């Protein structure tokens, strides 16, 4: 395996993925994941070379994240802003197919600024469950279940 050359995880100063909250995924010879500032990145799994970066999937903020779950030829993505996204990851970039607000974020990220104060960014860091064509998701106030089947809409 390869090791990145950067010693910082700040955006623009990293050459790989500094995955702090969620696990990156491997598809063939490629790695896709969210770094510690919300940047979705695609890497060559053989060399570690960064192929692309997208700021579109979730907020570009400290500890921003998204949970990636494979479903056939695409992925269900739940970002920390409460959106359910259907997407594909390719060697050339991120392809978003659809997005809908599934649940409201209700928890503070507790992120500290460089000056030591708490940044009040409201997030949802709960990984959903999938079963029998449904998604079950929660925040600090509710648990919801929604159908993922097209025939239900």
State the predicted function of each range.
Residues 1-153:
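Noncatalytic, solvent-exposed loop/strand surfaces
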